[in-house]
Amino acid sequence: MSMLFQSGALFTDMNVFENVAFPLREHTNLPEALIRTTVMMKLEAVGLRGAASLMPSELSGGMARRAALARAIALDPELIMFDEPFVGQDPITMGVLVKLIDELNHALGVTCVVVSHDVPEVLSIADYAYIVAEQKVIAQGSAQELQDNPDRQVRQFLDGIADGPVPFRFPAGDYQDDLLGRGN
């Protein structure tokens, strides 16, 4: 199992190559030549082979997220957990990350668990998805099953409706009383 944290969590004192090599050195007894080959293959898979010598501070946000993804796949895990992988990414980087996660899932047979508020991106790659509200699963199914779900709270979440079962306004007392200083 591996995890891609929202922040990427790269080691700031190691270059990209060393960040990806770290789990291989910690959890295997592979010879250095094989570690080098493996790291270069993982960096090639995420499009960063040419950035191997760069430090995390020299990377864009999207490049840092891809470097962290290369580290997450270094040990060829069967399961990868993604914590908000698309947050704060520009549309191009988001598209690249969606493509990479989809390729990992389908081409390599890796199970990917993606926790995200980016509904269109997740539903475009998910075989099965859950919608959680107030610590409870309120809907589950394929992307099509969720899109066809008539539940008002599911519709509000999927369609980005501002007011509905989840209210826009935080509960408050009488507005006029608050304006006139008669409220709490």
What are these regions (language model features)?
Residues 32-50:
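Conserved ABC ATPase "signature" region
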Residues 55-59, 63:
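Conserved ABC ATPase signature
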Residues 76:
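Conserved catalytic motifs of ABC-family nucleotide-binding domains
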Residues 80-83:
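Catalytic Walker B motif of ABC-type/P-loop ATPase nucleotide-binding domains
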Residues 159-184:
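ABC ATPase nucleotide-binding domains
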